[in-house]
Amino acid sequence: MVELGFPAYGPAIEKRVRPLYKALCDWRAAVTLAARRRFQQLRCNANMDDDGQPMFPPLPVPDWNNPSTDWRPSPPRSGPKKDFCGDLPAPLTSGPRLTTPSSGRMSELPHTTSSPRSSPRPRGPETSPSNEHIIISPPRNPPSNTTHRNVGHVSRSPSSSSSSSSSSSPSSSSLIVLSSPSSSRSPSPSPPRPRADSSSRPRRGRGSNRGGRSGPQSKGRKASPRTRKLEDEDYLPQETANRRGGGRPRGRPPKSGRAVQRNDIQVTSSSGLADTSPYDLCGSVWWEVPLPPPGRCWFGGLGGHRQALTDSPEIVEAIHRFNTSHGPVPVYVEEMKDYAKQYDALVNSLFHKSMKVNPLNWMHHGKLSPADAALNHIYVQKFQSSYDSPGAAVTGTVNRCIPHIAGAMKERKLLWAFPHIAASIAMTRRYCKDQKTFLFRSLKKAYASMAFPDNSSETEKGISSKPSTSPSVLITTSTQTTASPHAPKIDVTAIHGRVYQSVVDLSRCLADGSLDDPEFSFAGCTRPDCCVEEFDAARPLEELADACVLACDSVVAALLCGPDGPHRVAKMLSFYDSRITPHVPDSQQWEKCRILLVSWYNELSDLRAAVYGAYGNTPTSQHLDERALAARVVSLIAETIGPLVRQDPDRAWVRMGSRDITSLLLRDWRGTNDGDPGLVKAKHLRRTAELLNDGRSSKGTYGVFAPPRRPDQLFRGPGRPRRSTSSSQSASDKSPIKSTHRHTSDPIPISTPRPERDPAGTPHENTMSGPVQPAANGHSCSSTPTPAKKGNKTSSDTISLKDPTKTRIKASAKAQTDETLPETSTAHPSAMDQSSSLERKTLYTGPAVSSKERRRSAQSSTPSDIGGVSRKRKSAPEQYKQGLQTPLPMPEPSVGQTLLDPTTTTHDILSSSLPNRSCSSSPSPSKRPYHPSCYSPTDIMTGALVGPRGRQDRAAFRQFPVGTVIGQTPPQSVLNAYCPNGAFVELVEFARIPEPWQEVLRYSPEAMADIARVANALPGKYNSNEIITSAASEAFHTATSKLRARTAWMRYQQESPDDVSIVVLYSPLPGEHLFCVPAPDTPPGGLKFDNKRGGLSFLLAAFSNRLCLPKSSAWAGRWKAAPDISPLTRMGVLFLSTEDLGYQGAVEYLQRQCMKRKKKLIIMDTVEDRYRLPNGPCIIEEATRYMKCIISPRSQCCVRWPGLRDFGTTIITSRDVVGPLTLMDLEQYYYCEIGIEDSTINLCCTGNVRYTVETRLEDVSCVPTTPLFYFAAVKHVRPDFLCGETYSNRAARKWGLCAPLRPIYVIESKMNAIVSPSFLHPTARNLCRSVILPPDPEARPVVVHIPEGTCSALAEDMVASIRSSCITWGQHEEGGPETTAQENSDIRAMKVRPPTKPPYMSPLNIGNRDTTFTD
């Protein structure tokens, strides 16, 4: 109809013509696309290419919008009549330029304003979104001399509209470019006419086809600069796109989320969502990603696939781990199927830093568990590194944690490309660490609006205001609350600004005296919707002030309910600005500012709702800025109204009207005998209302705002540090029980140096003369030379060992190896002397002496020389030669083993007389200058070693920190102990104390005395032919073992005192030790379970959120090696026992260091007064956050009431017993001292401690095991849980073997106050009977607190979420739906059925704005 001259505008014509025109365009595009696909399938030669000639001539593009006023219908077409499918018409004079297929460049033609034959459309700047020219550009090099003209029209003028869209076939070799011509000199368009149905119809004339590009260039062809500029049209800013003919008027950017129409297909402009059109935002056609065949998975390039290993047990276990995990798995395989979950977890981790490590490092080379490492090995060996793999070079992913890119391409999720690009940045070596961090931050900023489209405006605002902050932080800390989708957002920043400005205005009015004006009315910054009539003038001013006080308290209570804790809330409330602090106004001045109090009351009410709403269902650390601003508002208002309430909130608390009514509402009226409960309730409420009405009429006080539960909790919350109560301490210490049999304890930590070897490979024959002192390893060594007696003949002839026997001590699997010592042992050479005299054999442990120096010494020194002794090795005793045929080994010390074997100590430990100090000869270079055995422990403790000049600076003596002492003060007698610096150095070297902890022992002279006592443990002088007895050997072995055990805490916990943040003091049971298993003081019958005194086992059980039973892994009697507490060590926790060497000086030294750093040391003291040492450490308030609690086995209900099976997994806890409450207080202290931004800790979770015990799988196993480790030993056993740990096949397959159950904690008001289960709430008893919590190494403890008098319905609502966490079994798992738990193998198992009713939403979690009250 347009060709025949009919007008191309108007509602009637457009309504009939436009659908036909669109159908014609769609049909032509479909035919062209099908023809090109068929051409690609039927071409014989791969180099054969299309000539690029379109199948149809271009259609005229009518202007459906408002045309120009001087438009006239074009006359009928004249000239030669051409066939519809014939050759192309003559060149159009209005076409700006042409596409040259041979060269890929655009031919430019002169612009014209009319084209009567080929362009009957009127002039206008707007283009139609549906009437488009189809231009087919060849994908490869066409014949060189072929040129087609007039195949496309693209405007060159910046003012013209050059919108285009592209579509292509699935094959990458074809391309369809859609473009439309436009006039370059048309007048500016008039605004479009409003239409009634404009909301339902697509918007026209707004440049719908903006930013088109001509598609990718052919292989081997270089695009012109103009073509590249057109291709990048969509990636330019809005102003540049408008300037380049984007079709949208300047100065009017598109609205966010508006749908852009291309070929009548809606494309949402938020790229994070799935795109429903076959075109992307650039106008290009999406790739067709075919699904892999059945039984195969995506692999390699686009369309590639591999065999799926669905039957492999490793894959099955990996799928189970993936389905149960909440975060991204480190190894993802396509058999897991749910790539959307992995992508979302990766994106969330990259934005919110939930991996606690650098995301780039984690993606590139993150640590893998054994199960994940095995899975990755299978994947690499079978597919990625195989020779027959077609996609060995292209795998479709960057790292093992990222799914194949085909899933993102098929789902059209542009956001899922973020992990691929981030992993590519992490993998490259072209950038340093800082440069990679910059690139990663720029990626996060680019993808922030895509990942969080709802917060795009806040994100842009935050990025512009804080350039250095990452988008993820800005998104999570926006100034708008996200309480509920139905509630309006409360702007906390605006509230803070209004309150701050109102306080400034009030201070200014007080300063200039305007408040004294009788006609003054406050006109400062107040709430816009505030009305003073809300509180009429008849109400007293004090009531408004009290209402503000209670409102302040409600905000403080809301802050205390959050994740910050009392100390951080107190730090927030400590905001003080002296510049705005107002003067003190009187009551008359406050009467003129009543509207200010009303405004503040409303602001505080909104703040309370905003703080509670920001928490959501679970309190998190997000919205920290909102809570900080809310705390500042409370601080400002409280300081301002403080003089009005006389700095005392008691007057607000005496308004008990609301409390009286609330207490009546909470009462249970069903148990009354006065008649109908409803009538009785109404009677009491009416009586209370009458009393309140009488008080109001007499200008009494009545309730304005419901106060908190306890008035004394204003500006105070849970978790305050407690001081230890002063009590009498028993003077008698419990003497340790000495063992009569050997224990595999840890010997003294000194390794014997290897003897130097000559080039032949034999050890040097180093001998030592003079008095021999006990070395650290139990062998004898010389310290100072003594003059030889006249007539003492020694042989100078020696026979060296040609084949010395060397042995290596094999560490037992039940013991822990010492990482600081070498594994190989020192050879024990034996020399046979040809002389008849028998001299005792000595082993040289001093510095190595070269053979040349030894020969020179042997030649210059003869046996007859005075003061000189032969350095040649003497022969072994006759008893040695007759008793043993081979030389005995000298074992290396290691944790869990003894230094001296009973069969070797008799002949290996040799000693002599004490050193002669009057020796005139100087010691040789091969001898130690002084031995610590010369120092007496009594002299150290009494201070007899103090020199005439007094105490030295580097000496060891007690130095109490100055401050207020907590608990008992150590006696003054401990201050007399003194150890000189020289003796300190030798004793520390003797005990092999780690260098970072040597400075700590300078504050503990008691430790020096203990080391000197061990050094003097060997017997005294004896003749040369004597061999020390077995009793002396055993005594020395016991002393060295205990010393090694007492110094183990310095080796296997913190590397340096600077890493200590929390100190836990405890008193172990006899036989308990944290690092030496079994301990040196283990009783002959082994450890005995004590249900009255808790030791190390119960302490570690509290930190690992588990039970401690006699047959559980937590009991020290079952340990085969030291428990693994490395997670607690990484958190800065240091366990100190009262039996550890130098624990007094360690506590005092750490306090001094914390005072220097202006921080406080967190101390958790679990030592009872009867087991406390009289010379214990001095603890002061100024340097510590001190917490006193005890370890009580009776907290476990199975220990307190052994006959009740309903409470087998229940623990009653309080703040006086080590448990979740005390550990949460420690976490709050930790956050106050370290800071929540630096790190987060979880002191009460199963993953904190791992035990090495004997299981049914192996004699020595580290539990809890991983499910994959147990998968190889499947065995159907019952029950599911034995002694509080997983035992059955299905339980171990799900959580691993010996994974502990999570106990249920019930709060006890006072220690041992619950003497019978009947004292517990019935709902708590039912909960403990019917709920078993599954093992979870990362889960927080579950604490049940049901106040007295709580009705059953409310109590059931409080524990509904706990019931939903009960263990449930799926239908595919073996066994029934019941969970069986057994305390031990001697009693009957208890069966617990899963909950039948689904959990429901608690009314306690509904916010104030979600509740509607109607009359």
UniProtKB/Swiss-Prot annotation:
Disulfide bonds: none annotated. Keywords: Activator, DNA-binding, Early protein, Host nucleus, Phosphoprotein, Transcription, Transcription regulation. GO terms for biological process: DNA-templated viral transcription; positive regulation of DNA-templated transcription. Transmembrane segments: none annotated. Residues 245-255 have a biased composition (Basic residues). It comes from the Viruses. Residues 96-105, 263-272, 465-480, 814-837, 895-910 have a biased composition (Polar residues). GO terms for cellular component: host cell nucleus. The keyword Hydrolase does not apply. It is found in: Host nucleus. A long stretch of serine residues may be a major site of phosphorylation. GO terms for molecular function: DNA binding. InterPro entries: Herpes_ICP4_C, Herpes_ICP4_N. Residues 125-187, 724-738, 911-933 have a biased composition (Low complexity). Residues 48-272, 454-480, 691-935, 1371-1415 are annotated as: Disordered. Belongs to the herpesviridae ICP4 family. This IE protein is a multifunctional protein capable of migrating to the nucleus, binding to DNA, trans-activating other viral genes, and autoregulating its own synthesis. It is required for the switch from immediate-early to early mode of gene expression. This is Major viral transcription factor ICP4 homolog. It comes from Gallid herpesvirus 2 (strain GA) (GaHV-2). The lineage of its organism: Viruses, Duplodnaviria, Heunggongvirae, Peploviricota, Herviviricetes. The gene is ICP4.
